[in-house]
């Protein structure tokens, strides 16, 4: 399997705000406190069969971790971390245990995927949970306007198929929003300003990594600029 050079960081979602770009247009952004992360393990094809780097984020009292975890951190020569994540990347050999990573690993304009735990919505019906249309508002429909309708025939198939979309608990699940653009990087405060919304509540843990799907070249090519007195030929 072909693996590219990826960049990634664990961070905390601080909330949303809006900023202005160079053209004085309002841009909605999510502020992420990215890192600092520390490299806790480096995996290579020779020792582990694949290339990856393990990152740790957030302090934790050493008394609150078990002996295997304590030994794992001691081997890397770092203090215990609350959260761990593995980033598969082809250039894992360029990392070393104990190395600290900050938001500087990303540049302005980088396309990223952001993973987090979505907000819990509680028990929800099929219209909210799955986007069902529901039944009619009139024409003899009685107290069944938001019901899913038939879930299966009584004789054929005589059962309810597995995986049928029904009402149930909604949200509080691992969710990834792909193809977001980093609007700005604040290296002094360690902030990433990501254009658009990301999963999870304020204060939630998020993982920012290089986009798995590369954008089309024409989507990222810089616009041509025309100087004073120049004309654009068709």
From Swiss-Prot:
<feature type="region of interest" description="Disordered">
    <location>
        <begin position="137"/>
        <end position="156"/>
    </location>
</feature>
<comment type="subunit">
    <text>Part of the 50S ribosomal subunit. Forms a cluster with proteins L14 and L19.</text>
</comment>
<keyword id="KW-0694">RNA-binding</keyword>
<protein>
    <recommendedName>
        <fullName>Large ribosomal subunit protein uL3</fullName>
    </recommendedName>
</protein>
<keyword id="KW-0689">Ribosomal protein</keyword>
<dbReference type="InterPro" id="IPR019926">
    <property type="entry name" value="Ribosomal_uL3_CS"/>
</dbReference>
<keyword id="KW-0687">Ribonucleoprotein</keyword>
<dbReference type="GO" id="GO:0003735">
    <property type="term" value="F:structural constituent of ribosome"/>
</dbReference>
<dbReference type="InterPro" id="IPR019927">
    <property type="entry name" value="Ribosomal_uL3_bac/org-type"/>
</dbReference>
<dbReference type="InterPro" id="IPR009000">
    <property type="entry name" value="Transl_B-barrel_sf"/>
</dbReference>
<comment type="similarity">
    <text>Belongs to the universal ribosomal protein uL3 family.</text>
</comment>
<dbReference type="GO" id="GO:0022625">
    <property type="term" value="C:cytosolic large ribosomal subunit"/>
</dbReference>
<dbReference type="Pfam" id="PF00297">
    <property type="entry name" value="Ribosomal_L3"/>
</dbReference>
<dbReference type="InterPro" id="IPR000597">
    <property type="entry name" value="Ribosomal_uL3"/>
</dbReference>
<dbReference type="GO" id="GO:0019843">
    <property type="term" value="F:rRNA binding"/>
</dbReference>
<comment type="function">
    <text>One of the primary rRNA binding proteins, it binds directly near the 3'-end of the 23S rRNA, where it nucleates assembly of the 50S subunit.</text>
</comment>
<dbReference type="GO" id="GO:0006412">
    <property type="term" value="P:translation"/>
</dbReference>
<keyword id="KW-0699">rRNA-binding</keyword>
């Amino acid at each position: 399997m072909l693996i590219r050079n990826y960049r990634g960081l664990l961070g905390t979602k601080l909330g949303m705000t809006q900023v202005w770009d160079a053209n004085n247009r309002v841009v909605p952004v999510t502020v992420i406190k990215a890192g600092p992360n520390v490299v806790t393990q480096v995996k290579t094809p020779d020792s582990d069969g694949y290339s990856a780097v393990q990152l740790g984020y957030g302090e934790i009292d050493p008394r609150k971790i078990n002996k295997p975890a304590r030994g794992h951190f001691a081997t890397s020569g770092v203090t215990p971390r609350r959260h761990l994540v593995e980033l598969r990347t082809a250039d894992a050999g360029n990392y070393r245990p104990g190395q600290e990573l900050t938001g500087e690993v990303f540049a302005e304009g980088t396309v990223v995927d952001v993973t987090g735990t979505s907000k819990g919505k509680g028990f929800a019906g099929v219209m909210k949970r799955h986007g069902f249309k529901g039944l009619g508002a009139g024409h003899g429909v009685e107290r069944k306007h938001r019901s899913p309708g038939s879930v299966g025939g009584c004789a054929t198939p005589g059962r309810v198929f597995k995986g049928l979309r029904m009402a149930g608990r909604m949200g509080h699940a691992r969710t990834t929003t792909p193809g977001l653009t980093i609007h700005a990087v604040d290296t002094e405060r360690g902030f990433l300003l990501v254009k658009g919304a990301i999963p999870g509540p304020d204060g939630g843990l998020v993982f920012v990594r290089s986009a798995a799907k590369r954008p089309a070249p024409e989507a990222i090519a810089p616009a041509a600029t025309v100087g004073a007195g120049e004309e654009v030929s068709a």
